[in-house]
């Protein structure tokens, strides 16, 4: 069952839509609905998601009936992506069977981070008769990895850095050697969408590759030793920034847990392309509420990262319920070239509750005792009660607009209390 505190946040956001402006439903009633009938509450959320998706498609396409079939396919894909995200959250983004498979292979290969890629190439050749070749970008163009099954050839793009080549070798190894394990895990998930199983299988293969590059016990120990210094972890495990940050969110093994980080990746427009929120019982990261039907709060440091590419930015953030989080964010280095997709820009954020911030190197020198208030952030403008926010894009639910021509405040909106 989808975690109740997340469902409450989702329904608050749902009923923050202007279409419900005449129905002022307090949070208490939403909690009552979830307590009495969680399935019905989940159905309301699913119905709104479908409505929201159709509305967004209609606004984007305008009067283009020829595009309706493509729009339906896009909507189905979006639903599948969200379904997989929620399944990963229910699992706390931790998969013990895949961890064990990765540990077994790494032990058999007897490798270090510095020769893992070569060992995987040899393993594919000796066990599966698969030859690996790095190809010019002019040949593969935008493709980074291509497996030619009939030729037993794995082609990797020269645009991939060492960490990317190792990762893609791990992904293809997962598909070839661990196909049955991946299929069993997908089957157990009991996903409802048509595209969900395929998306989840790819995600699990990526998980295997990350576990292969950064073995659980060793990586967790290094993260604690280095106070989660991302750059040093990159060097120690020959991994990329995103690979390291993603791996940190998977450290949820019972009795060997790491910090319960949440992770987000966005583009310059604020579109969320990756979201990982561990949600095991008692977890703090699960309390961080993300907008699931719109953009994130513009006051969050994640959006500032694009103005300082390559730098790690930090922020102590306070939600409207006074829950405080520590977040650090950075842009990702693009993979590719000017010709082949290398101009795409993304930023990622990793965050945790304040009680864990002292164990992160990037919090050194910050006021962690609460003497100074954190930066006020919210879920989305529709459900945020911060009346004086200078970055507010929409008026909040349950507050009538007040027009005073003789008064102008820092916010473009004025409201009745």
Predicted regions, residues:
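Short juxta-domain linker segments that transition from a proline/glycine-rich
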Residues: 4-417
């Amino acid at each position: 069952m989808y975690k109740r505190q997340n469902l409450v946040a989702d329904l608050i956001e749902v009923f923050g839509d202007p279409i419900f402006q005449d129905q002022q439903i307090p949070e208490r009633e939403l909690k009552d609905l979830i307590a009495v009938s969680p399935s019905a509450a989940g159905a309301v959320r699913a119905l709104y998601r479908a409505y929201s998706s159709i509305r967004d498609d209609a606004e984007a396409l305008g009067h283009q009936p020829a595009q309706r079939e493509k729009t339906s396919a896009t909507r189905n894909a979006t639903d599948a992506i969200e379904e997989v995200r929620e399944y990963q959250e229910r699992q706390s983004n931790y998969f013990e069977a895949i961890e064990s498979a990765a540990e077994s292979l790494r032990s058999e290969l007897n490798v270090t981070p510095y020769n893992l890629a070569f060992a995987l190439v040899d393993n594919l050749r000796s066990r599966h008769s698969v030859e690996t070749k790095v190809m010019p970008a002019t040949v593969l163009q935008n493709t980074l990895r291509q497996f030619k099954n009939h030729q037993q050839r794995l082609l990797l793009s020269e645009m991939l850095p060492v960490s990317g080549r190792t990762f893609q070798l791990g992904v293809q190894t997962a598909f070839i050697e661990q196909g049955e394990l991946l299929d069993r895990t997908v089957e157990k998930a009991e996903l409802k969408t048509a595209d969900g199983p395929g998306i989840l299988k790819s995600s699990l293969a990526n998980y295997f590759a990350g576990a292969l590059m950064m073995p659980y016990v060793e990586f967790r120990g290094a993260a604690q030793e280095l106070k989660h210094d991302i750059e040093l972890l990159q060097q120690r495990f020959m991994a990329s920034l995103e690979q390291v940050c993603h791996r940190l969110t998977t450290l949820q093994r019972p009795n060997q847990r790491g910090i319960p980080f949440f992770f987000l990746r966005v583009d310059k427009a604020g579109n969320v392309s990756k979201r990982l929120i561990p949600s095991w019982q008692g977890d703090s990261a699960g309390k961080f509420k993300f907008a699931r039907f719109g953009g994130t709060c513009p006051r969050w440091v994640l959006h500032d990262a694009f103005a300082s590419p390559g730098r790690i930015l930090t922020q102590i953030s306070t939600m409207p319920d006074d829950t405080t989080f520590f977040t650090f964010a950075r842009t990702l280095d693009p993979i590719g070239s000017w010709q082949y997709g290398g101009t795409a820009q993304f930023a990622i954020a990793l965050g945790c509750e304040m009680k864990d911030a002292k164990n992160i190197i990037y919090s050194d020198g910050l006021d962690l005792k609460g003497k100074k208030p954190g930066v006020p952030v919210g879920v989305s403008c529709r459900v945020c009660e911060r009346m004086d926010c200078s970055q507010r894009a929409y008026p909040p639910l349950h507050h009538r607009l007040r027009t005073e021509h003789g008064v102008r405040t820092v916010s473009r909106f004025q409201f009745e209390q």
